[in-house]
Regions:
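Catalytic domains of carbohydrate-active enzymes, especially glycoside hydrolases
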Residues: 107-133, 225-237, 290-293
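Active-site-adjacent "subsite" loops/lids of carbohydrate-active enzymes
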Residues: 83-100, 173-224
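Aromatic-lined carbohydrate-recognition surfaces of secreted/lumenal glycan-active proteins
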Residues: 96, 165-174, 235-237, 255-299, ...
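Glycine-rich, aromatic-flanked loop segments that form ligand/cofactor-binding clefts
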Residues: 121-123, 147-198
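Aromatic-lined substrate-binding rim segments of carbohydrate-active enzymes
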Residues: 73-78, 84, 128-171, 244-274
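Hydrophobic membrane-insertion alpha-helices, especially the h-region
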Residues: 15-33
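N-terminal Lys/Arg-rich, disordered targeting/topogenic segments
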Residues: 1-14
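Substrate-binding cleft of secreted/luminal carbohydrate-active enzymes
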Residues: 32-40, 44-46, 290-349
Length: 349
């Protein structure tokens, strides 16, 4: 259908006028709603309009800031059960517990521990060179069947609560199970018919390469477990190469041991947690940091000479002798004695 030109012009004008009228009416409606909003009163029954309200009138309560309270008490715990916040290492004087102690008389071990005063150092052997754990480890290797590992964890927690300084002893590079299951981490036989196979010491244990990534990751996992369990310090014993044997190692032994110690110390030690090393000689270049050097099988007559060979700072604090007698020549340095010695040494204290 054709619409004449004149008719189209009229329709266009009518449409423009209608659109303008709609826009004006919409603007008037919007302004009216905004103006009306000031008179709307909301109640439980709904909304009503009250034209008697003033636009300046405030309804409700004006919020004011709460006055500062001055009657809040602060409790300062300065008693014997207060937790020490000191980050400084102090000289150790305490006792050690072997795996055999716990196997033979676990209840007797616990009874002796109850007599020890807060801040006494207690070292607990929590893993043997075979690879058996004496705490509830999640590494996947065997847990002890001779000792209740959950009871050991409970004992550790009790010592921590009582304020004793608790140290875990773990073989670092001597581990039969881990070596057997991770052949590339172990020291190989150097010559002969079985060259390249895992080397085993006279006690039947495999030894691990100190700088091997698998070895260091395994030790890191163990240390983190022990830290979470509540230990203040972990001693990595057997932190050395075997003294002799037909094994092959092409690296610099001294440099690699130091490198392993520095790596573990840097990644694991904190202001409140120490990583220490059980070494074969006091000449070991112990890295600076929150760590100690532990020496075993040092006769009382050799204490002075052994300590003189150490090149570490604060030797009276960072050098610890694991002794088997009550000889007082050890007391100038850190010393840990068999727990049985506490029957005499703690008497009257």
């Amino acid at each position: 259908m054709n619409i004449p030109y004149r008719t189209r012009l009229k329709l266009q004008r009518y449409g423009t006028v209608a659109l303008f009228v709609v826009m004006v009416l919409s603007l008037i409606w919007f302004c009216w709603v905004v103006w009306l909003e000031r008179y709307v009163v909301y109640t439980r029954e709904g909304a009503t309009i009250d034209f008697t309200l003033s636009s300046q009138q405030l309804r409700g309560t004006v919020a004011t800031p709460e006055e500062a309270r001055t009657d809040i008490g602060i409790y300062y715990n300065e008693g014997e059960d207060a937790i020490s916040t000191s980050t400084e290492l102090t000289q150790l004087n305490g006792y050690y517990i072997t795996v055999q102690n716990m196997v033979d008389d676990f209840e007797g071990v616990k009874a002796r521990l109850t007599a020890l005063a807060p801040n006494t150092a207690v070292m607990i052997e929590v893993k043997n060179p075979y690879g058996t754990f004496y705490y509830p480890s999640e590494t996947g290797y065997s847990r002890s069947q001779a000792v209740d590992v959950d009871a050991v964890a409970e004992m550790i927690n009790e010592l921590r609560i009582r304020g004793l300084y608790v140290i875990a002893k773990v073989p670092a590079f001597r581990d039969y199970q881990f070596g057997l299951n991770n052949i590339t981490c172990g020291l190989p036989i150097g010559t002969g018919k079985y060259k390249g196979a895992l080397w085993m010491d006279n006690d039947g244990y495999y030894w691990l390469k100190p700088t091997n990534a698998g070895t260091l990751n395994y030790l890191t996992t163990i240390v983190l477990e022990l830290k979470a369990l509540g230990f203040n310090e972990v001693l990595l014993s057997d932190f050395q190469f075997p003294a002799s044997g037909n094994y092959s190692y092409t690296g610099d032994k001294d440099a690699d041991l130091l490198s392993a110690a520095e790596t573990l110390l840097k990644s694991l030690a904190t202001d409140y947690f120490a990583i220490s090393f059980g070494v074969s000689s006091s000449t070991f270049p112990l890295p600076e940091g929150r760590c100690r050097m532990y020496l075993e099988n040092v006769a009382p007559s050799s204490v002075g000479m052994t300590a003189a060979q150490a090149t570490i700072s604060d030797a009276d604090i960072r050098l610890v002798f694991v002794a088997d007698t009550n000889d007082t020549r050890y007391d100038q340095y850190g010393v840990l004695r068999p727990l049985e010695a506490s029957d005499v040494l703690e008497e009257g204290q």
